[in-house]
Every structure is written in C-alpha cells, then in structure tokens.
Design a protein with these regions (language model features):
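Short beta-strand scaffold segments in enzyme catalytic cores
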Residues: 67, 72-79, 379-383, 446-448, ...
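Bacterial N-terminal signal peptides
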Residues: 7-17
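Internal maturation/activation junctions in enzymes
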Residues: 289-396, 523, 548
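Extended C-terminal subregions enriched in glycine
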Residues: 437-439, 472, 481-528
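Active-site rim segments in enzyme catalytic domains, especially the processed small/beta chain
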Residues: 61-65, 72-78, 82-87, 238-243, ...
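Short, small/polar residue-rich loop motifs at catalytic or cofactor-binding pockets
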Residues: 254, 375-378, 442-444
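Noncatalytic scaffold domains of N-terminal-nucleophile
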Residues: 22-36, 40, 46-49, 53-214, ...
Length: 582
C-alpha cells in the first residue's frame, strides 16, 4: 500500500527511490536466538517480512516477558523494488462488552495499576498473528509454515534462560501463586528458573505447529481461540469478558504512514493509535530551529533543548492522540509547519519551563488532556533482505509477562491498561478512554528514514513504554545531527520527564552534568531509563545492524553465499545450560 498520509508534504520533499541492488541481508532483535531465527530465514532466501515474522515467533518463546503471539504490534515495511512504504496496525482491541469505566473502582476513582494489570479483564484481542498473515500475503517469499520452524524448535527442544529473563521472573514471583499455568512453565522445583536453566514449552510448540499447519484462522477460531477465551474468563484474578466472537472479528489494519521532513531527511512511521511517529516528528520539528550539530552531544544545552521539545510534544500527545476510528485525531495539524514553529517559539534556550499546556493545532477540536500509562513489556526487531526490502516491527504484550495469564503456552497481553483509566476529565470525555472495539493509544515507534535523494537509509525502534518515543528520537538525533555511528547513537544517554523533573539515565556521562542541566531552571534527577533499541542502517552502500548495548540483543548479516555472520552483540548460543531442565 502506498504512503498517502500528508501526501502533499511527502511528495514535495521526497521521491522514494526504488532499488534492485543486492547486498548483505541483516536481522537484528533484542535476543540472539530470535536474531538467529531471522538470519536463518534470510539465508533460505526469505524476504525481510519473512525474517521479521520468524523473529516475532521466536521472541514469543525466548523473550516471553516482552512480546508474543498473545499481543499486538505495528509494522512499517519498505518495498525497495517499487518504492512503496506500507504500515500494518496489529494493535489489540477492546472486547465488545468493554465500557469506559472498566478501570474505575467502586469509590469512583481509577484503580491502582497493580489491580488493573493482572488477570483476564486487562486482555485485549491479540493482533500479531493477523498482522503477520497480512505481511506474509503482501511480501512473503517462503511458505507460511517454514517461518514457524525456528520458534517451534526453540519451544520444543528448549532454550537457555538468560539473565534478563531470570530478573523478570524474580520480579513477578510474588504474584504468581495465582497463575498456575505460568508457574508450570517457568518455575523449576517450586522456584523461578535461573540463568542457565533450560525451559521447554511443549504447549507453545503445539500451538505454533497448529497455526503453521492450518494458517492464521487457527488462532482466531477453533481450539486455540477456545483456550484464550477460557483463560481470560476463568482467571483466578479479575476474570475478563473476551468472547469467541471478539477473536473471530479481529482484523489488522493497513494504514497510511505518517511522514514529515527533518533537516535534509524525511522520517516516516505509524499513524495513530500509535503516537510514536506523530510525537517523534513533533519533537524533531520543534528542535529543528536549533543547531544541535554545533552544540554537540556533550553540551548540556543540547539535552535541555531536547527535553523542552519533548515536554511540548507529550502535552499534545496526551490531549489529542487516540484511535482514529473513534476520535478525530489532528495529525496533519499537529505536524503543520506553522504550528510547529509556534510551539518551538515557546522554548527559551537558556531557561527551562516545568510545564507546557497542550496547543491548538489547525483542525483540532478542543480536547481535555489526560495522562495514560504504558509499561515496558515490549520489543523491537528489524530485517533487511538482499533486495533492500525493510521490515521494521515493534511488538508488545504491554507489562512484563502481560497480564500473567497463559493460554496455549503463551502469555496474554494487558493492553487495555494502555487506555486512560478515568473516562472523563472536567466533565469532558477523554480521547483515549476505553470503548468497545477500540485500540488503545501506544508509544510504539517503528521508524524509517529517507535521505535527500529518497533512499531508505535507517530503520529503528525500541522497547520502553512511553519512553520509546524518546529512545527513538535520541537515536535519530545521534545519527542525523551528531553524526555518530549507529551503535554509539543508540548508546547515547536516555532522558525523560516525570514527576516534575527531567530524568537522566544514571551511570552515563550526562548524569555527570546534572548540575549543568539544573542550571537551566528545573529539577533534574538520575533514573533507571534503560532501553532496547534495535536498528539497521545503510552505510556506504551496505546495510549494517546494531542492538542496544544495554540489552542482550544482536545483529547478524547474511552474505551473497547465504553465510551467516554475527555483526553486533554476543554469542548466539547463549549461556551453557545447567543440569536443570524444565
């Protein structure tokens, strides 16, 4: 599907260049086993979309805390032959019986998050399998069943628990007495599995084999659908109301990409209900008047300016962005150049402002801002095939291990907690409130960058909940403004704004400049702002890949002779297994 969003702007700035040149193929993800699955598919002659699909399925097995077939995601795809940029929205939907007060307590106040998070009532109808099916129909090269083989192998034969999974299992252990199915897979001898243990998941292997053999409908109808509905409605904690009809009715949505110029580039991403592209592009547009290249990455002023632009854009995000099937979302107004200039003029280069109101973009109806929350159970992966096609996808089950409910060996999401809990503010309906069939607002931001000649040169995304937007923005600035190598740009310090202060990633060079940042007139605090960025970049005519140094991710290349080569990150095999096998 051709990109037609902001079409006048897009055509004025960029003519996308088709290319048929062959080069090394690249896959990157947050887990080496998933990266290897993508590279395996590329080595078999698979397309970028095929490789992304294999990575998503493998991540269901080896990174169950972050994503999987029980969740949803967003895919941005670039077809190098005809220059088409397409996106698929696989965001979860609220059940047909969902109501705006779903997460309101009996006292009329929003529930505490921990009460809303766990159990069947927070589960949205999963979208990932439909997304993958649409992508495979449009751009797949290998057979559907072939793409499941690496994940089936990992689930059936077992995989080694890494430090990240060990840590996440320890973090939720106190909740799992209520979640028998989760314990049966991930606990050994009555305790959470440790790094070096081997986990086998035969139930998930069976589920994957069924979908591989019967196709995507096997997930949304029949035995697997029955398992999902049963797990949701009989959950010991907060049972939900998802039905077989909800699953059968689910459809992924092909949308127009959202694109805008930044300096000599054009940057594109997902339309709402993803807030990623709109907010990233607002931030970049707002700081474009400032010469970040001259200031450099080591000047506190650069980060002051980026932080102020972030606050302006997030104020608009909370007021205007939601599912466009339910709410008029003024994307073009939010990215209008005159409006961006008006917002940018509010920034004082020498003095921070603690709070910015939402603006009044062209074409927007007055809207009440309301804060929505997002947790960090998310992952990103990307692939470029030998023909230069790009598949760039962010996938999530929302919180760590989703809602903790397991069906068919996989975790279900708690995506409905991405809706704003309080449906009204000051007597007016909130844009991102719960409604039947609605898709909650997301910060997932799979992003593709084109150069001045219209050539795709960079694709990236990240995990991190509401911070995803800043992780992606920071990396873009690192590459496009500071001129850093991709890995170094990903490794730049993360910042965010929360609890009335500018938060700076602890144990980074920027954390040593807190006094300099505070001199601009706002509180600054160190914080744990870890990220999981994965990206591919065209450098001197050759695609490279990189994974966040904070993660256990990797990137692999496949050459013209279909030989695999690790180009970033650690070993593919992971830690040697201990004697404990589950």
């Amino acid at each position: 599907m051709k990109n037609t969003s902001l079409i006048a702007l897009f055509c004025a700035v960029l003519m996308v260049v088709p290319t048929t040149a062959r080069s090394e193929a690249v896959a990157t993800s947050a887990d080496p086993r998933a990266t290897a699955a993508g590279a395996e598919i590329l080595a078999k002659g698979g397309s970028a979309a095929d490789a992304a699909m294999a990575m998503m399925l493998a991540l269901t097995v080896v990174e169950p805390q972050s994503s999987g077939i029980g969740g949803g995601g967003f895919l941005v795809h670039f077809d190098a032959k005809d220059g088409e940029l397409s996106t698929i929205n696989g965001r979860e939907t609220a059940p047909a019986t969902a109501r705006p007060d779903r997460f309101m307590g009996l006292d009329g106040k929003p529930m505490p998050f921990v009460q809303a998070w766990q159990g069947g009532h927070s589960a949205g109808v999963p979208g990932n399998i439909r997304l993958l099916a649409d992508a495979h129909r449009n751009w797949g090269r290998l057979k559907w069943a072939e793409l499941f083989k690496p994940a089936i192998r990992l689930a059936g034969k077992g995989f080694v628990v890494n430090k990240t999974l060990e840590s996440r299992l320890e973090g939720v252990a106190r909740f799992w007495p209520n979640f028998d199915a989760a314990r049966s897979i991930y606990w050994i001898d009555g305790k959470p599995a440790k790094a070096g243990d081997v986990i086998r998941n035969p139930a998930l292997a069976t589920t994957l084999k069924t979908i591989a053999r019967k196709g995507p409908d096997a997930f949304y109808k029949g035995a697997i659908a029955n398992q999902i509905v049963d797990a949701v409605t009989t959950s010991k904690v907060s049972p939900g109301d998802m039905t077989l009809a909800d699953l059968a009715a689910y459809k992924a949505v092909e949308q127009n990409a959202v694109c805008a110029p930044y300096r000599v580039y054009v940057i594109c991403g997902m339309a709402p209900p993803s807030s990623g592209a709109t907010t990233v592009l607002q931030i970049l547009g707002t700081i474009e008047q400032f010469d970040l290249k001259a200031l450099g990455k080591d000047d506190a002023k650069s980060w002051h300016l980026i932080g102020q632009a972030m606050q302006l854009a997030y104020a608009d995000r909370e007021a205007y962005l939601a599912d466009p099937a339910f709410v008029d979302v003024p994307v073009e107004g939010l990215l209008d150049r005159s409006y961006i200039a008006e917002r940018s003029a509010m920034i004082d280069p020498m003095k921070a402002r603690a709070d910015y109101p939402a603006g009044n973009p062209p074409g927007a109806k007055p809207r009440t801002a309301a804060i929505s929350g997002e947790r960090y159970g998310t992952t990103h992966f990307a692939a470029v095939d030998a023909n230069g096609n790009i598949a760039n996808m962010t996938s999530t089950i929302e919180s760590v291990f989703g809602n903790q409910v397991v069906a068919g060996g996989f975790f279900l999401n708690n995506e409905l907690t991405d809706f704003t809990f309080a449906p009204e503010k000051d007597g007016a309906p909130v844009a991102n409130r719960v409604e039947p069939g609605k898709r909650p607002l997301s910060s997932m931001a799979p992003t593709v960058v084109f150069d001045r000649d219209g050539k795709a040169i960079l694709a990236l995304g990240s995990a991190g909940g509401k911070r995803i937007i800043m992780h992606v923005t920071k990396t873009l600035i690192g590459v496009l403004d500071f001129g850093l190598p991709l890995k170094e740009a990903i490794g730049l310090p993360n910042i965010f704004f929360g609890s009335g202060a500018l938060l700076v990633e602890e144990n980074t060079p920027l954390a040593q400049k807190i006094d300099a940042l505070a001199a601009f007139g706002q509180p600054v605090k160190p914080g744990d702002l870890g990220s999981k960025v994965n990206a591919v970049q065209l450098v001197d005519g050759k695609w490279i890949g990189a994974a966040d140094p904070r993660s256990e991710g990797t990137a692999m290349a496949v050459d013209g002779k279909r030989r695999l080569r690790l180009i970033d990150g650690g070993t593919i095999e992971g830690s040697a297994p201990s004697a404990s096998v589950h």
